[in-house]
Amino acid sequence: MASQGTKRSYEQMETGGERQDATEIRASVGRMIGGIGRFYIQMCTELKLSDYEGRLIQNSITIERMVLSAFDERRNKYLEEHPSVGKDPKKTGGPIYRRIDGKWMRELILYDKEEIRRVWRQANNGEDATAGLTHIMIWHSNLNDATYQRTRALVRTGMDPRMCSLMQGSTLPRRSGAAGAAVKGVGTMNMELIRMIKRGINDRNFWRGENGRRTRIAYERMCNILKGKFQTAAQKAMMDQVRESRNPGNAEIEDLIFLARSALILRGSVAHKSCLPACVYGLAVASGHDFEREGYSLVGIDPFKLLQNSQVFSLIRPNENPAHKSQLVWMACHSAAFEDLRVSGFIRGKKVIPRGKLSTRGVQIASNENVETMDSSTLELRSRYWAIRTRSGGNTNQQKASAGQISVQPTFSVQRNLPFERATVMAAFIGNNEGRTSDMRTEIIRMMESAKPEDLSFQGRGVFELSDEKATNPIVPSFDMNNEGSYFFGDNAEEYDN
């Protein structure tokens, strides 16, 4: 692990800032959050949304998607060059839900992208404020992570669907920058690389010419990002080997799949940030909260405090359970889709149940669903304790684990042993003799085999009372180690479809 001295903190990545001290970081993250809030308030005014409608998470998501679309330069350019029937490249929109005569109604709105860019810049002191856009992307990514399984995508790239704990950020757009790269899981980076190598195998010109040179630079950069997530020398050395390959092919794909499996036990470091829906920031700004003056951190108590007193609503389909919908959104808000359920449940102060047992579908409503039969209910997003978000995968040891997901990726810096069954993971290595046998592989397998069940595999700080803002009195929760900790265990969650 590179020493902290050479790494920019997340908040610096998030705000594109150079080295800053803690106060400056808190202020610049606060400025970013305040900008999102001001933008949201202005959009609600332009759309004439009532206070209640402005607190509806589905409306928040539509407004967020509109601003992301307005700033998606590559797509905008593509749309202008390839006009498709019935799609105006200069406009963006989506469903807005309004409460009319005691019923919810859907209204499809269309806006000039230019107009939305104007509102966004105005809310952000005239700047493009890309950090705020990335923040919104990460919130959408965290929501997808909590809602969908990526089984199909995993299988397509030759990985095991049980490796879903490595897939954080798999739906983040490419343009999400350093802050986006920080939150991507090992499996996500892996998959991007495998897709790239496969294209190279199928398309002779992929690595050639001027374009090929750019492709190569992107390939090496992605390799370096993935290498930076691994915590052991042998895993890093294997990544060097993949990066330096003259002509990446099947051997590299095998190495990458091997590394992804190894990450189930020798976990990578992946950042976690609490990114909340724009309407939450809007509510706070509207009530007079000055984020820039107060400062804000995505990895501390601030998001917990914000959620303690924000009332957000959601549309609920006739057979959905509002409490389950709340759990889904709570997990998304704290980037906790791959966290151990026992830890999440302790912090939330309510039992957190696996995805397969939730009676709820995604938050977004498809255009063919009938909204008039839907009710709205308050999302319960409060917590009993708070904990610092971690960027470390923790040191590892062995535990009984499930068929559905054979590892977790810790979100909260809380001490516990991590559930995984060594036999299950090691079985994934049997009979795979393709790729190169090398000292590195042997070394990695040796480390995995010697991972001990007794060790506390994740040394964290513990959780804190919400009154303990300075994190002075850690409470170390005790967990029933026989209980299952995986969210996607034995699951039938929907697949994510673009």
Curated annotation (Swiss-Prot):
GO terms for molecular function: RNA binding; structural molecule activity. It comes from the Viruses. One of its GO terms (cellular component) is host cell. Late in virus-infected cells, may be cleaved from a 56-kDa protein to a 53-kDa protein by a cellular caspase. This cleavage might be a marker for the onset of apoptosis in infected cells or have a specific function in virus host interaction. Keywords: Capsid protein, Helical capsid protein, Host nucleus, Host-virus interaction, Ribonucleoprotein, RNA-binding, Viral nucleoprotein, Viral penetration into host nucleus, Virion, Virus entry into host cell. GO terms for biological process: symbiont entry into host cell; viral penetration into host nucleus. Residues 8-22 have a biased composition (Basic and acidic residues). InterPro entries: Flu_NP. It is found in: Virion; Host nucleus. A motif (Unconventional nuclear localization signal) lies at residues 1-18. A motif (Bipartite nuclear localization signal) lies at residues 198-216. Residues 1-22 are annotated as: Disordered. Its main location: virion. The keyword tRNA-binding does not apply. Homomultimerizes to form the nucleocapsid. May bind host exportin-1/XPO1. Binds to viral genomic RNA. Protein-RNA contacts are mediated by a combination of electrostatic interactions between positively charged residues and the phosphate backbone and planar interactions between aromatic side chains and bases. Encapsidates the negative strand viral RNA, protecting it from nucleases. The encapsidated genomic RNA is termed the ribonucleoprotein (RNP) and serves as template for transcription and replication. The RNP needs to be localized in the host nucleus to start an infectious cycle, but is too large to diffuse through the nuclear pore complex. NP comprises at least 2 nuclear localization signals that are responsible for the active RNP import into the nucleus through cellular importin alpha/beta pathway. Belongs to the influenza viruses nucleoprotein family. This is Nucleoprotein. It comes from Influenza A virus (strain A/Swine/Hong Kong/127/1982 H3N2). The lineage of its organism: Viruses, Riboviria, Orthornavirae, Negarnaviricota, Polyploviricotina.
